[in-house]
Curated annotation (Swiss-Prot):
Keywords: Cytoplasm, NADP, Oxidoreductase, Queuosine biosynthesis. It comes from the Bacteria. Belongs to the GTP cyclohydrolase I family. QueF type 1 subfamily. This is NADPH-dependent 7-cyano-7-deazaguanine reductase. One of its GO terms (molecular function) is preQ1 synthase activity. It comes from Oceanobacillus iheyensis (strain DSM 14371 / CIP 107618 / JCM 11309 / KCTC 3954 / HTE831). The gene is queF. InterPro entries: GTP-CH-I_C/QueF (IPR043133), NADPH_dep_7-cyano-7-deazaG_red (IPR050084), QueF (IPR029500), QueF_type1 (IPR016856). GO terms for cellular component: cytoplasm. Substrate binds at V78, E79, S80, H97, E98.
Length: 165
């Protein structure tokens, strides 16, 4: 079957909504899922989110970065508009870059229980230092657990040239 019927989309409420509300405070409840129609296949889904902002927990100064989310879905998949609104909800959330990346990954694991997921942040420099945190997860007891270990070990073997974000 090609396409999706209304029954398959009943839990997707934000997509197509003309009255979108932007919450400036951390709101994981906004995340929505839909069913993966290809559960018999392993494949990656990647989101590139270049407009992520949050606040420094100490100074309240804004931090800017790009978030990369890659995952291998199982039964559920995250809906992209809800993900956009969720990431937007970090705007007034005060946390360190490393914490934000882990919070995002943990919320997505709780939401959709993927086979594998990795979240990477590329934050613009503050004080002359840029921070690029990376975290990942592979479902325990599966090949994805070993995959997570290998990708973590190799995630930055060939670091990029940092000249301008």
């Amino acid at each position: 079957m090609v396409g999706r019927d209304e029954n398959e989309l009943q839990d997707v409420q934000l997509l197509g909504s003309q009255g979108t509300t932007y919450d400036f405070n951390y709101t994981p409840e906004v995340l929505e899922v839909f069913d993966n129609k290809h559960v018999s296949r392993d494949y990656f889904v990647k989101f590139n989110c270049p407009e992520f902002t949050t606040l420094c927990p100490k100074t309240n100064q804004p931090d800017f970065g790009t978030i990369y989310i890659s995952y291998i879905p199982d039964i559920k998949m995250v809906e992209s508009k809800s993900l956009k609104l969720y990431l937007f909800s970090f705007r007034n959330h005060g946390d360190f870059h490393e914490d934000c990346i882990n919070i995002i990954m943990n919320d997505l694991i709780d939401l959709m229980n993927p086979r594998y997921i990795e979240v990477r942040g590329k934050f613009t420099p503050r004080g002359g230092i840029s921070i690029d945190p990376y975290c990942n997860y592979g479902r325990p007891g599966t090949k994805f657990e070993q995959m997570a270990d290998q990708r973590l070990i190799q995630h930055d073997m060939y670091p990029e040239k940092i000249d301008n974000r």
